[in-house]
């Protein structure tokens, strides 16, 4: 016979697995549609018209039209395509289901059009809203917070292809007690995360790791080098933190989202022309291309880091629907490669992983997620102790500092983005 604690944990197991699978399938469908549209916009259409896909006019035109299209969706869709991600944390309160169609369309347009944002925030919003709405009907005795936790865990597992990130994130939020141990509370979320990760793995494998030279043995000087790299990444990230709310306030004085996003898309197009095609899109595939290109110099990596960070700020400030984690990882990789080229004595494994740790920490203010992203992009167990040590001064530097988020005006309704 199972102990009552075990039976309690099993109660939500089936819903957790179902939510994890559904979270992954929603992500897969959205990404597939966006991929097809991206191929149409950036491969087939310019080829048919006899235009180079890296033509400045094409890049500016596609991104400007993408901004206008997203603005029209936000202006006229029911629920205005959900909340502005610049004003929301990664895991937020559930939104009305009526806002989800517009949010999904806005996300797909942004991903396909080359906007420098990832899918994580809108997908999280969609999955949480559906889990809460459907779960409240099927199992009304389960509170909204439980459904929110299961949906966010399933989404994290699906996004990263592993339940490890969910385990790390929720271990700091689901505090255990003498009555309910931590792992009792983690059981159902980890079931959802595992189901999401396994479902994603059936269709594609998220490819985060980079072909960077193996790091052999940790030296004391490497800790100092890593801390300096993380501090440089944090300094760059804090510039973006300072710029985001100011640019957001300036752009949204125009009130009309079509105009705001059209201008935002035009600026992104100009940045894309300067940085080239590798500086477009969410950044995961592009960072693989960046590492594979042996022709890039220190100044090239610096330019890519600056352009991508600027594009991230512009996209978020304009109101495009997307997340900031994936493009931030690209910025970290570019910064790390730049610093390694500048000081070759410091291994690239250290510069890249510590730069990712610093910039993701600025964007998310989540130590576990920052460690996870650094560890999966540069998968080397020898680096783990160094990253844990470097995290300490990095966390001190950011203590009490503002987050990369815009404070929503009090008079503005929570989901009215007109």
From Swiss-Prot:
Query: One Pfam family from the UniProt entry?
Result: Voltage_CLC
Family that this chain belongs to: Belongs to the chloride channel (TC 2.A.49) family.
What is the name of this protein? Putative ion-transport protein YfeO
Q: Does the keyword Repressor apply?
A: no
Residues in coiled coil: none
Q: What keywords are assigned to this protein?
A: Cell membrane, Ion channel, Ion transport, Membrane, Transmembrane, Transmembrane helix, Transport
* Disulphide connectivity of cysteines: none
Listed Gene3D superfamilies: Clc chloride channel (1.10.3080.10)
Native species of this protein? Escherichia coli (strain ATCC 8739 / DSM 1576 / NBRC 3972 / NCIMB 8545 / WDCM 00012 / Crooks)
| Keyword Magnesium belongs to the record | no
Q: What is its main location?
A: membrane
Q: Which domain of life is it from?
A: Bacteria
Protein's gene:
yfeO
